[in-house]
Amino acid sequence: MSNALTNIFYKYVARRNSTWMAGAILGAFVLDSTVSGAVNTFFDSVNKGKLWKDVYAERVKKGISQ
């Protein structure tokens, strides 16, 4: 079983440099997007009520801003 999976991996992925590069670039893009989204969500939750988007929404609700 393991040998068959290794052969498939080599035949379709590891054999050509272009597939390695495509996988590395795609993996980096997915990792960057995931980490950025998680960090931004965490930052927004820690600073809830202190960010301009929260202050502005409150001002609009009170009728102070447009």
UniProtKB/Swiss-Prot annotation:
The chain crosses the membrane at residues 21-46. It is found in: Mitochondrion inner membrane. It is a single-pass membrane protein. Gene3D superfamilies: Cytochrome b-c1 complex subunit 9 (1.20.5.260). It comes from Dictyostelium discoideum. Keywords: Electron transport, Membrane, Mitochondrion, Mitochondrion inner membrane, Respiratory chain, Transmembrane, Transmembrane helix, Transport. Its main location: mitochondrion. Component of the ubiquinol-cytochrome c oxidoreductase (cytochrome b-c1 complex, complex III, CIII), a multisubunit enzyme composed of 3 respiratory subunits cytochrome b, cytochrome c1 and Rieske protein, 2 core protein subunits, and additional low-molecular weight protein subunits. The complex exists as an obligatory dimer and forms supercomplexes (SCs) in the inner mitochondrial membrane with cytochrome c oxidase (complex IV, CIV). Residues 1-20 are mitochondrial matrix. SUPFAM superfamilies: Subunit X (non-heme 7 kDa protein) of cytochrome bc1 complex (Ubiquinol-cytochrome c reductase) (SSF81514). One of its GO terms (cellular component) is respiratory chain complex III. This is Probable cytochrome b-c1 complex subunit 9. GO terms for biological process: mitochondrial electron transport, ubiquinol to cytochrome c. Belongs to the UQCR10/QCR9 family. Pfam families: UCR_UQCRX_QCR9. Residues 47-66 are mitochondrial intermembrane. Component of the ubiquinol-cytochrome c oxidoreductase, a multisubunit transmembrane complex that is part of the mitochondrial electron transport chain which drives oxidative phosphorylation.
